[in-house]
Amino acid sequence: TTALLLAIYEKTGLPVFYGPALASSFGEFPPFVDWTYEQFETMLQGYGNLPYTFPVPQYWTDEFIDWSSQDRGKEPRKNQWICVRPGRAKGRLIGGNLNTMEGFFGTDYMPEIRKGDILFIEDSLKDACTIERSFSLLKLASVFDRVSGVILGKHEKFDDNGTGRKPYEILLEVMGESEIPILAEFDCCHTHPMLTLPIGCEVSLDAEEKTVVLLENPLEKIECSR
């Protein structure tokens, strides 16, 4: 999904919506499917006047139940977003699944990450060694020198390789002396429920207040391009 969405955005300049998948998200049991669908519908059909603050779901889950035998909703866990490094930023939202982005980074289908962008990244079913390598790729490509803030999504079934370290702790170590704001455990990823994010639109990030605010209407941008 990340590859298709970012390629479409790069070739057309139109905002794209990073969000739930048909089977894995909309096929989920209540209550998570209800919240995911509500946020998807809100983003595509209207959310009132801007600015729009993305809501924090009360609960989340990454419990695995085989679809062929699932007969109950997944176990909810108390939810919170985490301020890793305080600060405020405003810029174009860009990003997606980090492992997928690595596969076409630097090609004609990957949008250039510009000065001032807010980078959104998430991943799933990886271990500490793998994401350290992925974060290091971004650092070596000077991505962290260009972006004004980072939003890190929850990591489904993360394997810490016995280190006890969280993905955001590894990110902080890789980034080193960078002082840009970082908000972690954001709910637009492979866990449930899931927000829908308009890639290519301007947002503001306040890591200390744990808020992400949409400043630009994606539907108006699409309409104006016709």
Feature map (PLM): residue ranges:
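Short, acidic/small-residue loops that bind anionic groups at enzyme active sites
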Residues: 1-26, 178-182
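Internal helical hairpin/lid segments
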Residues: 106-162
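Conserved beta-alpha junction segments in alpha/beta enzyme cores
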Residues: 78-82, 88-124
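Conserved anion/nucleotide-ligand pocket segment
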Residues: 15-97
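Conserved active-site and cofactor/substrate-binding residues in soluble primary-metabolism enzymes
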Residues: 3, 31-35, 92-100, 126-133, ...
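Structural motif
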Residues: 14-17, 91-92, 117-119, 148-149, ...
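ATP/nucleoside-binding phosphotransfer catalytic cores, i.e., glycine-rich phosphate-binding loops
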Residues: 149-226
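Solvent-exposed alpha-helices and their adjacent loops that cap or buttress functional pockets
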Residues: 9, 85-86, 93, 111-113, ...
